[in-house]
Amino acid sequence: MKLTKIIGLFYLLFSIGCSDFLDEYSQTYIRASKISDYDELLLGAVYIPSLTPVPPTYYVYPSGSNVCDFLNVLDDDSNVTTEAEINRAGGDKPINEWVAMHNVLFGYTTWQQFITNTELTEHNDQTTWVQLYQRIAIINSTLAEIDDIDVKTDEEVADYYRVKGEYLFLRGQFYLLLANLYGKPYDPETASSDLGVPLKITAGVEHDKDKDTQFERTSLDRIYAQIVDDLKASLEAFGHSSKHVLYRASEEAARLLLSRVYLYMQEYEEAKTVLEPIFSNITLSSLVSGDTLGGNNRFLTEENSEMIFSQGSQFSEVCWTANAPDFCVSRDLYDLYDENDRRKGCFTLNTGTDSIALSYKYNTGNYRARVSDVLSMRAAEAWLNMAEACAMIGGASEGTANEYLNTLRRNRIVGYADRSYSGEELVNQIRLERRKELCFEGHRWFDLRRYSVCKKYPYSKKIYRSFSFYTSTYALDRIETYVLEENDPAYVFAIPRTVLEFDTEPMPDNERPERIPLESAD
């Protein structure tokens, strides 16, 4: 079966009306006949690809037009470089491209009420929503049929379990992203009434012409229950057949993601239990025994032994140069690192702007960057998740939490001596280490959300963001400062306008406040 026929079928759903789609479906649908068809579909239409710059001399940069590419400009680890004029000396993109990136990310990084409709730019905000639901539609149809495939050889049986496990993993991951972008953070006390996103796990198109609302938002507790079910089912499938390949989901990836889900749900015993088997199959890389970061020596590459899984592109290679109007690393983050902490070598001081650049965490350059900065998974998170779970359990488990925390630090900080913490201080140290270790990897925004509803040790903070506005001749016009309040409604994204407009009576939206600058500096 040709991959293009399979992919084309599912994309009809988003290009023509529902009733027309049903007619088209009955006329053109061709059932996959062997497990390799589903494997081919998985690679071609379900995994999020790593983008190749076009033309090849350009970079791929965040613009809201790729799945979750904006995540790392939302939180308190980044800021915007402010200078009297735009300075792209030595840059590889035309200045208008850098200005376009600056303008389109304004709504995201300053948490505007309408993130894609601002004074600087106007475009649609549906990309992440649509692309994830497109993939979920393919997964749903595949899972409805894959058990009917006739597998005969041992190799085919192994491939069946592996491929099915990957589909289940990806549906769980995609719904987790959607729920944490368009729903409130999971609060066990309110999850049964808090609205998430539409939950659909069945195949086919369900359209009732007599209903004014076709899509309804599902409560967070039901969405998370489905995510857990999918990831548990993927683990069961991977138990029969799993290969640890960086760009394919595996048992290790499923265990790590499920532990993250349990932390979001504040189910710490479950997080600990699902993680325990993983440590015999993964390793931490050591920064203290190798060369310092710099030059061609970068931290997160395909060759790093602690990489578990990655899909999608890498955008941090280009944004955090600390040249105006690019982004820079916040001083708040930079000052957290001890001078003996080798991770500090990821950052460099841009002497021209006195701002901090993210220089050596990822490969940089105009090429296909394969390790994602928003959708990759690695061993360090497993150590941090286990430490957090044990710290929250408390009692004798605090000793285990300290062991995992100290192990990670010994591999990052030269001359580090083990320390012992307890109670809230232990949790705070783990959160601190998580921020330093996983910065610019798509974690911090979601972590800040979940900390705010943590029952045992809640935490929230204000985030300040300065943003530079430039004239048509690239001279500085003004600098405005915005603030994201503690527990701000803008921690939840609005439902895309095109989704709301589809129905006569739209699903409830997430209200975001108008974002007024605190001050304006000329």
PLM feature spans:
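Conserved, well-structured interaction surfaces
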Residues: 98-183, 218, 233-241, 367-379, ...
